[in-house]
Amino acid sequence: MSYYDIDAILTDAEPLKAGTKVNLPLWLAEMLAIANTGDVEGKSFVSFDLPPAMGNDVVQALKADPRAVPLRDHSAHFYGLAIHMMELSEEQELAAALRKTFITRASEVALHAQGPEQDATGRWISIDLIHIDLTRARRLGQLGSRPSNRGLGSASPIPEHCAPHMTKNDELRPLQPADTEVGELLLSLHIELSHPTPTMFSRSDPT
C-alpha cells in the first residue's frame, strides 16, 4: 500500500459488513476462526472455506485410492495443512479420508524405502514432506544396522532439492516453522454476523 494511496487508506479504515469475503494468511485466519467475539453467544463472527487442497474433489479422490493422488501437487505440506484444518473444522468425512490416506501411503513409502536408491528418486515429487521424513528415518535405520565407513553425507538416499529441511547427519531435525509455508497459505473467511467488526479490523473515522 502506497502512503499516498487514498483508496487503500480508506479501505483500511472502513468497517467490514456482514457477508464480506476476505483472503487472509492461515496464521491470521486461524486465530480469527477460533475467536469467539461475536454477538451471538458461542458463535464466532467468521466462518471459513476449506482450501482447494482439502476440497471435495480431493477428498473423494483420496477415498477412492489414496495412492493415486499426487499430494505434493496440491500442497508440499499437505498433512501440516490438514492438521490445521482439522483443528478448525468438524468435517468427519475429511478426517476419515485423511486417516486412511496417511496409513495407506505410509505403508507404501515404508516398502518403497527398502528398494535401491535410484528407484526412489523419481517418486519424491508426488509425496508429502512428512512421508519423506518417514522414508529417511527408514533408511537411517537400515544404514545404522549395516557396517559402513561412509557418512550419511554420501549415503543419503534423498535428493537435496526434494528435502530442503533435512540435514546430512545421523539425526533427523524436526520441521521448523521457518521451513514450512503453511502459515502463509490463504484461507477465505466470511464475516457472518451483522454486528460491527472488532477494532482489530477497522477503526472509526474521526468526526
From Swiss-Prot:
The keyword Chaperone does not apply. Pfam families: PSF3_N, Sld5. One of its GO terms (cellular component) is GINS complex. It is found in: Nucleus. The GINS complex plays an essential role in the initiation of DNA replication. Component of the GINS complex which is a heterotetramer of SLD5, PSF1, PSF2 and PSF3. Belongs to the GINS3/PSF3 family. This is DNA replication complex GINS protein PSF3. It comes from Chaetomium globosum (strain ATCC 6205 / CBS 148.51 / DSM 1962 / NBRC 6347 / NRRL 1970) (Soil fungus).
